[in-house]
Amino acid sequence: MVKLVCAIVGVAGSAFPVDIDASQLVGDLKKAIKAENAMTFTGDAKDLQLFLAKQPVDDESGKEVVPVYRPSAEEMKEESFKWLPDEHRAALKLVEGESDDYIHALTAGEPILGSKTLTTWFYTKNNMELPSSEQIHVLVVVPEQGSSVPTVSQDGVFDHCINPFFLQFRTVDKVGDWLEFSSLLPLTRRQKLYIRSSYQVIANHALFNPNVGMVKYAVVTGTPGVGKSVFVYYVLWRLIKEKKRVLLFDNNGLFYFDGSTMLICLALPSKFNEQFWSPDLWCLVDSMDPTSIPGLPYRLCSVLLASTPRRDCIGEFKKQPPTADVFYMPLWSKEELATIAPMYPHAAAVWENRFDCLGGVPRLVLQDIETDPQALLMSACSSCSLDDCIMLVSIYSEINSKTKIVQTLIHIHSQEPYRKYKVVYASDLAMQLIVRTKWRFDRAKLQSLLGSSDGNPLAQSLCGYIFEFYSMDRLEQGGTFVYRELFSGKRKRTPADGTIDIPRSSQPRQVAERVEVGQHAKQLYVPGTSNYTAIDAWMPQFGGFQMTVGKTHDIKGGAADDLAKLGQNGNRLFFLLPPLYYKTFTKKTPQTIKQYAILVPYPEVRNELSASTLQ
């Protein structure tokens, strides 16, 4: 008599002992397992699949693999294989009902036949040690209950899959943070899929269904090109490894995994076939409205939809009960992109600059790299109105040619657990180009954002750049401004406001390479390059200027040297400040520079924002 500890794969807290004689058949063990779990498993005992829980061994690369006994190898007869310790990582996850790569590997082989004796199974065929305490001995895989579906139906709905990419999913293994395929992924044309940490988090929550017997809906959305379709392949792989039924709606066709075999679906089964259409079936839909797919009875099965933020794909589906869980795919970090960049050697010299300009979107950074990133942003700015450029993208957004283009500029940002999001611009460069291109023709509306952008985070993000343009215009025109001298924090009393007259520039602002002695007095100069680090503008014999939109603005390196070249009364620095920061702005280091705060009031507010931008 031996005592075996068995565990049902995928069921938390399901480890249990079974006492049985080693001379009995595997079929007898199945009956004993069913007797111990009458409430968990209601099918026939013969349908249970049993696998040995072997302790892993390390291969040459250090990866844990399942040991395989070869009776012909003399060295294998000298030492028995060990059982899985109950403190091993895989065992701990097993008893918690979670999946694990090594558990998948143990259950990926052929289950033992019920006609074999336990002695033959354990010792003759696998050379296992004698079972003892603090071990897991047998893994039990319970087939899908109440959903026995024929693989190839009598009316020819299904056929055997011959697509090499989809055919390989059952045998694909996770290697580190990668899935390694023998065929190219249709979307990336690569043989590896990088598993982002966000993929795992989103999939865990999206596939979790606490209401057994009820359908589960989930929506995964995000910026175009961020990898939602690749994520669908990751979810497909996970469900297949867990031997779940999956129906994939893909551009290459309809693919169905019945729990053991990958098939191609030539026509959907009848919507009245409740044996097929049941909550345990996961339908994976990419960029299509599930409610409008002919023949899909979406109310009878679980559905995961991946789509860009668009009402025509998500809106109607989101209305259906039970309400879908919505997840927002995050932008890629620079570190994540660096991980996959070696797969795109043609982008090696440009991808980091493209990331700085276009944000964390792999399609734009690594794949579609023919167009210069600044030219791409300029084209988007020119094609879209200001209202388009401050449109709050959401799952209820209407999609047209302009909204597709504007999503080059506007991205969806999300953080774990990826249930909430905010809209952000692709980069600082994107914001600069929006303001620069709209300043000529939409100046009044841009200026109106300075005082009326509350509630629109995109408009608020632009305000700093708008203020720079607006302040430069005011500076060029000259006039009387409220100002105050800045002193160190040790001074107890803040000096009262006064007024200062800034002379009107004798000519329109002049572009200069740098500050030089002898430049014309009462002439406003600006640097010719955006990376000039000293001061933003200067007027000989008056002083230098910094456009400032925050409390923490510091004096740039080289400013003191530039100010010294501005002649009599020129060795002073003026910070041009919006009303929000004028009163609280303090003197900056180096404090040897004479510093002043100038109040630049916002223009009179006229609310010219269209209602659509605030929806």
Curated annotation (Swiss-Prot):
Residues 18-54 are annotated as: LQLFLAK domain. Its main location: secreted. It is found in: Secreted; Host nucleus. Residues 1-17 form the signal peptide. The keyword Signal applies. Glycans are attached at residue 531. SUPFAM superfamilies: P-loop containing nucleoside triphosphate hydrolases. It comes from the Eukaryota. Keywords: Glycoprotein, Host nucleus, Secreted, Signal, Virulence. One of its GO terms (cellular component) is host cell nucleus. Residues 55-136 are annotated as: DWL domain. The keyword Glycoprotein applies. A motif (HVLVXXP motif) lies at residues 137-143. The CRN proteins have modular architectures that include a signal peptide, a conserved N-terminus, and highly diverse C-terminal domains. The conserved CRN N-terminus harbors a distinct LXLFLAK motif, which is followed by the conserved DWL domain. A highly conserved HVLVXXP motif marks the end of the CRN N-terminal domains and forms a junction where diverse C-terminal domains are fused. The conserved CRN N-terminus mediates the translocation into the plant host cells. Belongs to the Crinkler effector family. Secreted effector that elicits necrosis in host plants, a characteristic of plant innate immunity. PANTHER family: HOT SPOT (RHS) PROTEIN, PUTATIVE-RELATED, PROTEIN KINASE DOMAIN-CONTAINING PROTEIN-RELATED. This is Crinkler effector protein 15. It comes from Phytophthora infestans. The lineage of its organism: Eukaryota, Sar, Stramenopiles, Oomycota, Peronosporales.
